């Protein structure tokens, strides 16, 4: 039985991989960095990626020793692997693809390119030198890798085109609220959720006068959010998609959720806060004018961005978005066409099976 090792470090990558691997891979032994969802479809866990997942240089320091311990475990398991699928997570995977090549892994696939177009463009060269295939999920990324003749580059669209769809009917969703719902997305990692709760606590009370503020999140964070902000949380699968389809506007921490909201046609404000040192270093390195993929793809600031800004500035930004929601919604309508046609998951599954 051929062996596939999965290396990933965040929930978005896990969601895409879950959808791809849940059918057609019965003849393969798949193991690696996992979560509960991946384990349910038979992926064997070497470690949970949540143990090493973090954002920013300063934020990562407390997890260094844990990371090194898990990394040694990964290398031990890679020795008899036929295929490595490295998903995004450049801090982990750019080192891992080099070590995998040294260990004699036959086939190395990089799925979801690091954002080399935003910063550290030399990472593309590292991927080209150590990988056999790169599968990109943004239309303009294919061009970046075309200059490397020995690397096979693939693009079939963005998985979110298939995945972003409502789970409940509007009537079923709305009956839980007395006021208009206002989705609040705080992030997917514990550190960023804690920072954003602290940042937004002051304006949530103000917003609750006019809206039912709801926070779609993961089960492990729901009690903390409910206790600190006194808002309702939603933890069922696809809750954020229902929020985006059935609300007029949202407050969203920068990340995949902004693109999901954009695909759903939901006007929103993008905010984010990191350690000041991380922000200072990042600002010097990043080469793109926007942080949200929505704005990058549409080539203008359709959804306003508030990075390292005060809660009052974020509140004013939200009020402006809410007033202009129809205009913003119209501009968001072109995103699906930019990101590819439907059946992206099926095409990715077929591509992976062809490669491995």
From Swiss-Prot:
Signal sequence range: none
Gene Ontology BP, a term: lipid A biosynthetic process
EC class name: transferase
GO cellular component terms attached to this protein's record: membrane
Keywords attached to this entry: Glycosyltransferase, Lipid A biosynthesis, Lipid biosynthesis, Lipid metabolism, Transferase
Function: Condensation of UDP-2,3-diacylglucosamine and 2,3-diacylglucosamine-1-phosphate to form lipid A disaccharide, a precursor of lipid A, a phosphorylated glycolipid that anchors the lipopolysaccharide to the outer membrane of the cell.
NCBIfam families (UniProt xref): lpxB
Protein name: Lipid-A-disaccharide synthase
Species assigned in the record: Aquifex aeolicus (strain VF5)
Gene that encodes it: lpxB
């Amino acid at each position: 039985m051929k062996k596939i090792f999965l290396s990933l470090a965040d929930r978005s990558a896990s969601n895409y991989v879950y959808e791809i691997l849940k059918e057609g891979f019965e003849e393969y032994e798949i193991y690696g960095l996992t979560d509960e969802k991946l384990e349910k479809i038979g992926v064997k866990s070497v470690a949970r990626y949540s143990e090493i997942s973090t954002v920013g240089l300063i934020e990562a320091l407390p997890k260094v020793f844990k990371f090194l311990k898990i990394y040694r475990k990964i290398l031990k398991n890679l020795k008899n692997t036929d295929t490595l699928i490295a998903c995004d997570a450049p801090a982990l995977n750019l080192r891992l693809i080099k070590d995998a090549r040294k260990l004699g892994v036959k086939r190395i696939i990089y799925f979801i390119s690091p954002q080399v177009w935003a910063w550290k463009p030399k990472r593309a060269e590292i991927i080209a030198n150590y990988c056999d295939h790169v599968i990109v999920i943004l239309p303009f990324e294919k061009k970046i890798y075309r200059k490397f003749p020995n690397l096979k580059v693939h693009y079939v669209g963005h998985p979110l085109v298939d995945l972003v769809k409502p789970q409940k009917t509007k009537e079923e969703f709305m009956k839980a609220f007395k006021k208009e719902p206002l989705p609040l997305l705080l992030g997917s990692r514990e550190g960023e959720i804690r920072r954003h709760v602290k940042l937004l606590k002051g304006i949530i009370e103000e917003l609750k006068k006019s809206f039912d503020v709801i926070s779609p999140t993961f089960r492990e964070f729901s009690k903390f959010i409910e206790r600190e902000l006194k808002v309702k949380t939603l933890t069922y699968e696809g809750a954020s998609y229902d929020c985006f389809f059935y609300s007029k506007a949202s407050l969203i921490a920068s990340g995949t959720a902004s693109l999901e909201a954009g695909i759903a046609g939901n006007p929103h404000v993008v905010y984010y806060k990191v350690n000041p040192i991380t922000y200072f270093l990042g600002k010097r390195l990043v080469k793109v004018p926007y942080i949200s993929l929505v704005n990058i793809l549409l080539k203008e600031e359709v959804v306003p961005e508030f990075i390292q800004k005060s809660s009052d500035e974020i509140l004013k930004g939200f009020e402006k978005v809410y007033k202009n929601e129809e205009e913003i919604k119209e501009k968001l309508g072109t995103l699906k066409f930019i990101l590819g046609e439907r059946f992206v998951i099926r095409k990715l599954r077929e591509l992976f099976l062809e490669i491995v």
